[in-house]
Amino acid sequence: MSQKKIDLVIVTGMSGAGKTVAIQSFEDLGYFTIDNMPPTLVPKFLEIIEQNNDNKRVALVVDMRSRTFFKEITLILDQIEQNFAIDFRILFLDATDNELVSRYKETRRSHPLAADGRVMDGIKLERELLAPLKSMSQNVVDTSDLTPRQLRQVITEQFSSDSNSASFRVEVMSFGFKYGIPLDADLVFDVRFLPNPYYLPELREKTGLDQEVYDYVMKHQESNDFYKHLVELILPILPGYQKEGKSLLTIAIGCTGGQHRSVAFAHRLAETVKKDWPVNESHRDKDKRKETVNRS
């Protein structure tokens, strides 16, 4: 069996250009990530990944900390190319001098290469030292006019191995309004206007996952009309959320107790969405009433 290659992205560039946002984006894409790794430790780390880790997608932030940085990283890149089954790319993040100065003023942090505290001097020195590495980089991104969200979007577009599955998934959940709206919900839909199976004794103890309840909820015209509009709303916007670099979209559907109507709707929606996107289906309050009755 051929050995699976390591997919290595080395994230570097100007201090203040967005490396922290970048490494978080790679983590959302499913990469194994480490921030601020000394170049000399990279080969040993890759050896461990090669032998012991199923995840062969790795992103490392390697910062400029000394004048010997370029010499070190060049030697390391040659070494790993010779000794490992690896595909590696360098992502270089840049920004204009004025933008970098503005960011340092905003955060009130000192530049790592500004010995006398003058940020512009540190930027000029760093730019000079990194120029050869920038010329070697396969991906150069100017973040001067990018928001953090836009930078995440750029990284997603350039490094996601699968635009649907690697970087984005959907959580479809049901809940009961009487227990509170889920705090992590991105989209919330209310189905309390639909006929309630709770008032039918033969359905009261069942849930929306039981066929009898599901059929009762979905047999009404207003249920099917609402579901049609719900799908027409949700499916077209999912690519937009994925494009924005969002890794998880939580869609919450609520009824009064979270046992019947919302469960049926969440299940139906999950079955529809999973045809095109990775989906996790959950029902937060489905058994809450039963648990309350048992405790009383």
Curated annotation (Swiss-Prot):
A GO molecular function term, named singly, is:
ATP binding
In this chain, ATP is annotated as bound at G13, M14, S15, G16, A17, G18, K19, T20
Q: InterPro entries under this entry?
A: P-loop_NTPase, RapZ-like, RapZ-like_N, RapZ_C
Q: Which residues bind GTP per the record?
A: D63, M64, R65, S66
Which PANTHER family does the annotation name?
RNASE ADAPTER PROTEIN RAPZ (PTHR30448:SF0)
Pfam families documented for this protein? PapZ_C (PF22740), RapZ-like_N (PF03668)
Instruction: Give the family, as the similarity comment puts it.
Output: Belongs to the RapZ-like family.
Organism placement in taxonomy: Bacteria, Bacillati, Bacillota, Bacilli, Lactobacillales
Summarize the protein's role: Displays ATPase and GTPase activities.
Q: Which UniProt keywords apply?
A: ATP-binding, GTP-binding, Nucleotide-binding
Q: Which Gene3D superfamilies match?
A: P-loop containing nucleotide triphosphate hydrolases
**Protein name listed in UniProt:** Nucleotide-binding protein SUB0630
